[in-house]
Curated annotation (Swiss-Prot):
Protein name: Probable indole-3-pyruvate monooxygenase YUCCA10
GO biological process, one term: auxin biosynthetic process
GO molecular function: flavin adenine dinucleotide binding; indole-3-pyruvate monooxygenase activity; NADP binding
Function: Involved in auxin biosynthesis.
Keyword field: Auxin biosynthesis, FAD, Flavoprotein, Monooxygenase, NADP, Oxidoreductase
Gene: YUC10
Highest taxon of source: Eukaryota
Pfam families tied to this protein: Pyr_redox_3 (PF13738)
Record-linked InterPro entries: Auxin_biosynth/cation_transpt, FAD/NAD-bd_sf, Flavin_mOase
Length: 383
């Protein structure tokens, strides 16, 4: 099949890219490996998830949220928004298409994308002038290699598989990772009566959603360093010194940290209070080894657990199928070019949703990619 643009991934960034291209009447096809769009939100998000950012930072092009929508949305409200977005713009991804390879054919200056239809088992070949990688930052769940992990006698899961603490009442559960997922899952487990311990390796900023909302609004008018100083000061006033509870604050500000490392500040949902009250235990460092249900930590501490939830992020799988990834990506699956031109590569290869700026970043990428493709096509037409 031939088309002008192939988009790989039907998450928010992929959907937005298709809509933006359609606004310019540019033919495009979305290939999605799952059987539904936005599978991260529809299949892999835990039940109590709420968006930590205000609604104006969680919307896609050409369809802002209405006044009736609360400032901070639940998962259900955002999924409903995505459903309405797909219906309004009549987006029709090709589902159950696992991309096996993508290469640039120098002989005809086109991308050759090979995908497997996992329902029929057939191999499909797509040719396009432009290729957009929109699989996003959250690819495959990352579970680190730990000595003896295969001997663990309890349940092991990645945070993307976690739904609710309902089944963990009275069980000893370790959550590995002190980011937003780890902190929120710990809170949920504790609420359902699990004996919860969270393992935190690196320092993280902890703020309220209101403070981060203020900070993101101010970033439109003030430099990052100034906003970081204000946000950090407010966090100190609200929480005081949390180091005695095992929560350490980085030296670099929250927005600078997010910008340069991709690590977002933790938006507190009530976890800090439970840590202060001793309802959630904190261990700093990493896991040394596992033997049955007994875990030995790097600090020498030993403890038995019934379950481990790895909230240890994701790893990009882009380089596994994008053979010519070096035109836009590094080996870690993130853009080579610095912001704000991170979305544009060579040979008409683009990426959307890799800016480490969440939904808003994916929306910005989508508009930039579509505008650039429109400009290139217009130039070719005039020549």
């Amino acid at each position: 099949m031939e088309t002008v643009v192939v988009i790989v991934g039907a998450g928010p960034a992929g959907l937005a890219t298709s809509v933006c291209l359609n606004q310019h009447s540019i033919p495009n096809v979305i290939l999605e490996k799952e059987d539904i769009y936005a599978s991260l939100w529809k299949k892999r998000a835990y039940d109590r998830l709420k968006l930590h950012l205000a609604k104006e930072f969680c919307q896609l092009p050409f369809m802002p949220h209405g006044r009736e929508v609360p400032t901070f949305m639940s998962k259900e409200l955002f999924v409903n928004y995505l459903d309405a977005y797909v219906a309004r713009f009549d987006i029709n991804p090709r589902y159950n298409r696992t991309v096996k390879s993508s290469t640039f054919d120098e002989s005809n200056n086109k991308w050759r994308v090979v995908a497997e239809n996992t329902v029929t088992g057939e191999t499909e070949v797509y040719w396009s002038e432009f290729l957009v990688v929109a699989t996003g930052e959250n690819g495959d769940g990352n579970i680190p290699m730990v000595e003896g992990i295969d001997t663990f006698g309890g349940e092991i899961m990645h945070s993307s598989e976690y739904k609710s603490g309902r089944d963990f009442k009275d069980k000893n559960v370790l959550v590995v990772g002190g980011g937003n997922s780890g902190m929120e899952i710990s809170f949920d487990l504790c609420n359902f009566g699990a004996n919860t311990t969270i393992l935190i390796r690196t320092p993280r900023h902890v703020v309220t959603k209101e403070v981060i909302h203020l900070g993101m609004t101010l970033l439109k008018y003030a430099p990052v360093a100034m906003v970081d100083t204000l946000v950090t000061t407010m966090a100190k006033i609200l929480y005081g010194d949390l180091s005695k509870y095992g929560l350490f604050r980085p030296k670099q500000g929250p927005f600078a940290t997010k910008l340069f490392t991709g690590k977002a500040p933790v938006i507190d949902v009530g976890t800090v209070e439970k840590i202060r009250d001793g309802e959630i235990q904190v261990i700093n460092g990493g896991i040394g080894s596992i033997n049955g249900k007994t875990l030995t930590f790097e600090n020498g501490h030993k403890q038995d657990f019934d379950a481990i939830v790895f909230a240890t992020g994701y790893k990009s799988s882009v380089c596994n199928w994008l053979e010519d990834y070096e035109y836009v990506m590094k080996k870690d699956g993130f853009p080579k070019a610095p912001m704000p031109k991170h979305w544009k590569g060579e040979k008409n290869l683009y990426c959307a949703g890799f800016s480490r700026k969440g939904i808003a970043g994916g929306a910005e990428d989508a508009m930039s990619v579509a505008d650039d493709i429109r400009s290139i096509l217009a130039t070719l037409k005039n020549n």
